[in-house]
């Protein structure tokens, strides 16, 4: 039996170069489609798979209380160094279980993370995301499509499959988009998805 490859495999080897590329593109450019779904006022936000901290720092600058989850030690240290002045709570944790992450959040961001999980992990992770987001909050997810870089662990996951899985755990898609790669890789494309918890029902009647 082959040993299990961690979902974040490959990111520690070239962490400095990866961070340089991430930091070279602004949060507002990469996540333009997510901007309308950010909380309207101060709230709790978690960036799962925070990488170099670019997104977490941008969210903190908007006044949110931000938790950055990053399992790769090299990237986490780089993020803490680059954004030392930002009000970010960094934690060492990973999907699918996120055992160290406490509380609930108004906005849950997963940027270029979901395709690193295999099918059983995606089921467990979606269940956990549904637990983390508050009623009226949003889960924003970007999904990479394209060839797998050497040394990385990625799976072919469609937006349709992801939406169907989210629905199993009470998360409805309120936004679906598809776009090109911000780093100008011609063979890479992205799906953008935003989910919201479905309202509770009583005797089959929504309220």
Segments and roles (model prediction):
Residues 106:
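Conserved acidic residues
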Residues 109:
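A conserved beta-strand element that flanks and buttresses the S-adenosyl-L-methionine
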Residues 112-113:
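Short catalytic micro-motifs in class I SAM-dependent methyltransferases
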Residues 131:
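Short, conserved loop/helix-junction motifs that constitute active-site signature segments
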Residues 1-46, 51-103, 117-124, 128, ...:
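Class I (Rossmann-like) S-adenosyl-L-methionine-dependent methyltransferase catalytic domain
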């Amino acid at each position: 039996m082959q040993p299990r490859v961690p979902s974040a495999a490959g990111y520690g080897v070239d962490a400095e170069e990866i961070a340089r590329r991430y930091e070279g593109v602004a949060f507002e450019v990469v996540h333009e489609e997510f901007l309308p779904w950010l909380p309207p006022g101060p709230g709790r936000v978690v960036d799962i798979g925070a990488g170099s901290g670019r997104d977490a720092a941008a969210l903190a600058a908007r006044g949110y209380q931000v938790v950055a989850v990053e399992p790769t030690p090299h990237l986490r240290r780089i993020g803490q160094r680059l954004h030392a002045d930002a009000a970010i709570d960094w934690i060492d944790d990973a999907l699918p279980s996120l055992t160290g992450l406490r509380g609930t959040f108004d906005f849950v961001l997963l940027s270029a993370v979901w395709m690193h999980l295999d099918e059983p992990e995606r089921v467990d992770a979606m269940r956990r995301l549904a637990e983390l987001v508050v009623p009226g909050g949003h889960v924003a997810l970007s999904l990479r499509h394209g060839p797998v870089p050497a040394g990385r662990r990625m799976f072919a996951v469609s937006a349709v499959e992801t939406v169907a899985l989210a629905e199993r755990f009470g998360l409805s898609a309120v936004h679906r988009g598809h776009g090109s790669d911000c780093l100008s890789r011609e063979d890479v494309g992205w799906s953008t998805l935003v989910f919201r918890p479905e309202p509770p029902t009583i005797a089959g009647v929504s309220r």
